[in-house]
Amino acid sequence: MLSLLFFWGHQPGQAFSKSLKFTLDSKTFFKNLERKPVPVRAPFRIPSGETRTGTILKPAFQYNIKKGINIELGGLMDLPFGQDDGISEGEPVISLHIDYLPGWRFTAGTLNREHPLLDAIFDDDLEFTDLAEHGFQIQADTRKLRQDFWLDWELNETSTRREKFVLGNYTQWMPGNFMFDLQVLWVHFGGQNNSGGPAENNFTYALGMGYSFSKNRFKESREPYIKKWNSQKTGFTVHYINSHDRSAGTSDNFVTNKDSGLLFKLFTTHWDTDFYFRVWSGGSRHFLPRNGDPIYTNRDFEELGMEKTWWLDDDISIRGSYQISEHRDGTITHTELLSVQWHIDFTLSKNHSDTVPNQH
């Protein structure tokens, strides 16, 4: 990786345009979760149903230093509806992006947090509850490979608080109509000089394979590093998911929980709408992925779902989804989502240069 960056940074001069532009991204969402609370050992629990609605704004300035290198400075703001506080959360956006190979990107600073991990490992609700991640990231989206590796440093150690970081990886290889993937998420609490308690580790991984019965043809995405297929598809995936948690218990004793399960998914796309049937076999009070959807702690469920995205323009989309699940005890849960996304940008300045000076 470092050798590729070094080689890329010492290429002969080439034409480029330095430019500064302003961008604004907006996502207005309504998400309703109808669930029955289930007590699980703290800090894990299946929460009761709730409704989240609001707008997430991302205003930013982007400066293109040279071809393949740009800096992004801005902010992320959460504006929940129905609250008196206005902006409930704000995060800075400070990123350096280096596109060093076709389809490959290295990021330092604020990360792209739309990780393609399974919901059991990385809950998609975090999109609305945890606005930003900061650290380092390597992403790839090519014809046969999809990669997302990142380090998110969430908390620095103090005299009374443990440090916290999250290390994640998603690697998907797509030879022909087959798919193989490896997914890993490690959540660590620790440090050496604090009174916040002993070190804790939560490690979850998944091994998966799949097959599509129709030929998958890669299509350039409207959004960077998000895979889209230019054809209808029907197929299945199977994942083995394992969770290992070691947390502090009472009287400075550690409590270790380990469990695993199988996730089967049958999917098809018709009328530009995604349909799927998913079966989860496994899970228990000992299946405790710290950043995963807590519904997987409940043993065994079947789920039907559908999702559709309407593109009104290249920069305006509406997405709707619905899923309903039946659990082993007969409980029915369902989730509805409606979101509207739009993007605008305009150039503030542009300076064209015929060549980039060679570095000596």
Language-model segment annotations:
Residues 49-57, 86-92, 130-134, 161-167, ...:
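Residues that define the transmembrane beta-barrel architecture of outer-membrane proteins
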Residues 64-68, 99-103, 142-145, 174-178, ...:
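Outer-membrane beta-barrel channels and translocator barrels
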Residues 116-123, 249-257, 265-267, 271-321:
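Outer membrane beta-barrel transmembrane domains
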Residues 332-360:
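Outer-membrane beta-barrel "beta-signal"
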Residues 57-63, 94-100, 136-140, 169-173, ...:
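Residues on the lipid-exposed face of transmembrane beta-strands in outer-membrane beta-barrel proteins
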Residues 62, 69-154, 278:
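Outer membrane beta-barrel
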Residues 139-266:
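Signature for the C-terminal beta-barrel architecture of outer-membrane proteins
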Residues 26-28, 40-44, 69-81, 106-108, ...:
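Transmembrane beta-strand segments that form the barrel wall of outer-membrane beta-barrel proteins
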